[in-house]
């Protein structure tokens, strides 16, 4: 793929695929057009292992961002001939870690100051697999993969609304944050989806000597920073969560449909996408 100046940062669950059945029904052909025409960067709360499986299935040979902005993964056979400093690597990817290690986050929640809140958390990685399947809608194999966290601690909250607000305030002093992702709360540290978007945007500018236009698409609270920092923002309707309130007056587009059809709908509201696809056809 030749470089063009549009980067599309997209959440996955509830945005690109349905929360209900994890399917892409009705948008597969459109997704393929987007993959061939633009730079689609998945920016999700999902793990490296989950997203890697997804991009392999749909042949998306682009960087992606895992665990709510905690790490950016660059395919070794992708666009870049060089990679950011401080990158680590595995067999298939170079990756830039932006967030805290899971072990560091775990060390904070063992502190006496936070223990009373932790007692109301049901952490994803500690759940019985049947419960993970029930709450995520994933099959057995994918549920096991979702528990293999490197940089975050998703959890179900059993306490009150007042207590979770207090918990959110308490963790800030440790450079941690708690964000809601549609089904689970996520305890993360050191980064978020918006910061990761800016890191990757700036690296594209450095490598290709042009500042790319950024588009962000999401449906939940954990997408808010990404939506705020993008040039164009697409919000996908999600009946299961509160409507995201974005402090932007321009270039915000709201779908009338839920995922996955809402993903196609909101992208086609944006002139740079619509005009480019019409020209290519």
Give the residues covered by each predicted segment.
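Active-site phosphate-binding/coordination module
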Residues: 23-123
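Mg2+-dependent phosphoryl-transfer enzymes with acidic/Ser/Thr/Gly-rich catalytic loops
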Residues: 2-4, 24, 184-281
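Short hydrophobic/aromatic-enriched beta-strand-loop microsegments
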Residues: 61-67, 141-143, 233-238
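Asp-based phosphoryl-transfer active-site loop
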Residues: 4-21, 227
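Short, acidic loop-to-helix structural element flanking the phosphoryl-transfer center
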Residues: 20-38, 102, 163-165, 190-203
């Amino acid at each position: 793929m030749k470089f063009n100046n549009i980067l599309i940062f997209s959440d996955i669950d509830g945005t690109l695929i349905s929360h209900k059945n994890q399917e892409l029904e009705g948008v597969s052909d459109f997704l393929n057009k987007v993959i061939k025409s633009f730079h689609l960067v998945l920016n999700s709360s999902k793990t490296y292992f989950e997203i890697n499986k997804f991009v392999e299935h749909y042949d998306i040979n682009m960087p992606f961002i895992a665990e709510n902005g905690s790490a950016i993964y660059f395919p070794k056979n992708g666009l870049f001939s060089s990679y950011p400093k401080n990158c680590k690597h595995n067999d298939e990817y170079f990756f830039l870690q932006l967030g805290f290690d899971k072990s560091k986050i775990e060390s904070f929640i063992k502190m006496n100051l936070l223990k009373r809140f932790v007692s109301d958390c049901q952490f994803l990685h500690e759940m019985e697999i049947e419960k993970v399947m029930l709450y995520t809608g994933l099959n057995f194999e994918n549920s096991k993969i979702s528990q293999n966290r490197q940089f975050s601690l998703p959890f179900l909250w059993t306490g009150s609304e007042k207590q979770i607000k207090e918990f959110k305030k308490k963790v800030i002093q440790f450079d941690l944050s708690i964000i809601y992702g549609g089904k689970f709360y996520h305890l993360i540290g050191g980064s978020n989806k918006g910061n990761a978007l800016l890191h990757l945007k700036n690296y594209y500018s450095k490598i290709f000597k042009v500042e790319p236009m950024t588009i962000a698409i999401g449906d939940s609270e954990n997408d808010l920073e990404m939506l705020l920092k993008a040039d164009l923002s697409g919000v996908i309707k999600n009946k299961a969560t509160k409507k995201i309130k974005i402090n932007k007056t321009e270039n915000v587009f709201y779908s009338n449909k839920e995922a996955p059809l809402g993903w196609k709908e909101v992208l086609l509201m944006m002139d740079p996408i619509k005009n480019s696809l019409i020209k290519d056809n």
